[in-house]
Amino acid sequence: MIPGELHIADGIIELNVNREKVIVMVINNGDRPIQVGSHFHFYEVNNALFFNRNFALGFRLNVPSGTSIRFEPGQTREVELVRYSGELKIVGFCKKIMGKLSK
């Protein structure tokens, strides 16, 4: 094996199988593009993004790790969110939630 070399299994690798997911419609009401990363707590994204935040509590974008979605000014798009797993401790981000979520 070469340092840094990756051995990836053959076939399709499915992400977030059997995890709770929701789809939300998001509108960028701002005058600048907004980019949201794969593991950012979607409930706490920029306030210029308009959507029903109640559906996003405890969820993140359902995209591969390290990627993001960009919302252009005035753009409306549908995104799929996936529930965080583990202990559900949400800390940091924009400090709107600083603790453990109930399941």
Swiss-Prot record:
HAMAP family: Urease_beta (MF_01954). The keyword Ion transport does not apply. Pathway: Nitrogen metabolism; urea degradation; CO(2) and NH(3) from urea (urease route): step 1/1. One of its GO terms (biological process) is urea catabolic process. The keyword Zinc does not apply. Its main location: cytoplasm. Keywords: Cytoplasm, Hydrolase. GO terms for cellular component: urease complex. Its EC number is 3.5.1.5. InterPro entries: Urease_beta-like, Urease_betasu_sf, Urease_subunit. Heterotrimer of UreA (gamma), UreB (beta) and UreC (alpha) subunits. Three heterotrimers associate to form the active enzyme. This is Urease subunit beta. GO terms for molecular function: urease activity. It catalyses: urea + 2 H2O + H(+) = hydrogencarbonate + 2 NH4(+). It is found in: Cytoplasm. Belongs to the urease beta subunit family.
